[in-house]
Amino acid sequence: MSVTQEIHLKTIRENRGISQVELAALSGVKLRSIQMYEQKVNDIDKAQARTLYKLSRVLGCSIEDLLENPEL
């Protein structure tokens, strides 16, 4: 995985002024999942569509904005 993944989720979240805890509470995605995506332990490109939808809705971005390789 590349650093791009971290940039997408973490940077978008930080630019919105939302903490990981807040994002978890607002989106319904587990805090540990968010942490693992941002730390590149889990590949966000392999996340369930529902998870990506929840994150994108709260962050006000497209699902593609969160993906490392949106063209795949």
Language-model features, listed with the residues they occupy:
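Short coil turns linking two alpha-helices in DNA-binding domains
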Residues: 19, 30-33, 48, 62
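Recognition helix of helix-turn-helix/homeodomain-like DNA-binding domains
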Residues: 29-45
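Alpha-helical residues within the helix-turn-helix
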Residues: 14, 25, 57
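A short, Lys/Arg-rich alpha-helix, primarily the initiator
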Residues: 1-15
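Short amphipathic recognition helices of helix-turn-helix/homeodomain-type DNA-binding modules
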Residues: 65-72
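DNA major-groove recognition helix of helix-turn-helix/homeodomain DNA-binding modules
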Residues: 49-65
